[in-house]
């Protein structure tokens, strides 16, 4: 398969880069537009990185490629492509490998031209394009050393502040560094004024991490001897210069005054106090009673690290016993006194009263001689404490929870009273409804226990006359029988006037004139007479049958004996169930 899109994009991007004119903004815009498309066309559909040993489907028209190591994994496309879902059709594509190498070479070429400087100076698109160029340059072989132009390119993006004494010629101070073999990638971050070396081994750079015997010597690269300097006298300008760069990386470094003495309290400005309040988690706890030592690390470069004490709050604190001036209590919340008894009428808002922000912004008055210091509190739990009516203390529980428990108890009592008045022990459905009304999740340890009611003993026989607690004999008089409504037969009915037509087997009684044969059978079932067959005369004797049905069954059975010839004609009885 021929990757047409990637090839066309490479040709167009190469033509624009080779014919680039620094004064042509249109060409610069086209390059910034084509480079991301070219990079996207060479991306793996599984991991999203630049293709390594690319493979592509053979019988497909789509432009989806994956790395050889990503074969068989799920692609990130939504919805998935139906052309390339079968990994058995993927084979190695040499043209894609050539295009990936061409992309790397193109990125290397851009870093050595004036186009790279224009990309860095551009504010709107510099980050995206620099990421693409860095992605392409990282795939270079480790044996090849990047050129010095990449280092100078990084210097233009974030210049290195000099820690030595200012010289008359600033270019002369940078010349030893530019001639050194130290090389920095374009996308590398600069922390504390010196670049990082992430992803490279320690052997690559000859950095001697300072020991306690030699705390201030830094040797970079064995082939170049850099002037050894004493940096302890120039620490304040280093911190002041790099403070702006460190804010973007989440590290907060405050400038120290030069006349700090052991045992004195550390002076903090208003801005530093506010900054420490906003970024408490990222602030390092520093103690000024120890001399700062300059240390160098491989991951972060040389940086200023002060010996710290692990405290409960990440703010700058003083170990001096004498505290003077206004104390800033906004960093640590005010803890309620444990031995003080409070009345129940006091509000919870009086427990913790934070210092108004206006006092911090305005700072101390003109008459105050001592600066703003931070009071060091003892390590006790800072959980808000609420008082119990008996004088003890418990962790703070909001008022809404306590009020809700009281309301739950009241609602539970009212609900139980209503359910007791409405409940009738004779009906099971109402008992179930009462149980559902009783809240199960509202019970607290101090709430009253649930009252259990015993079910009334069910009475045998018919429900007629027992629908109420006091049975009445006039229940079915002029009303529908409850047994009839439930389609049940009346057994041992105690009411008078009940005309329930349901039998014990669940069928209805039929009148004698409706279906004579079936009415006769129902009468037989009601009386419990076992007769295998009942003979009925033909249509000629239908009148006699009607008369017989009106008469008692015993007379009918006595009239028709087995000796009668009319019994030879058996009746065909049909039961419609």
Swiss-Prot record:
Question: Can you tell me which residues bind Zn(2+) 2?
Answer: 62, 64, 81, 84
The UniProt keyword set, sorted, is: Chromatin regulator, Chromosome, DNA damage, Isopeptide bond, Metal-binding, Nucleus, Phosphoprotein, Transferase, Ubl conjugation, Ubl conjugation pathway, Zinc, Zinc-finger
Q: Does this entry carry the keyword Chaperone?
A: no
KW Phosphoprotein (keyword) present: yes
Q: Which GO terms describe its molecular function?
A: histone H2B ubiquitin ligase activity; promoter-enhancer loop anchoring activity; ubiquitin protein ligase activity; zinc ion binding
Record-stated family: Belongs to the MSL2 family.
Name of the protein in its database record = E3 ubiquitin-protein ligase MSL2
Question: Which organism was this protein described from?
Answer: Mus musculus
Lineage, please? Eukaryota, Metazoa, Chordata, Craniata, Vertebrata
Task: State which gene encodes it.
Answer: Msl2
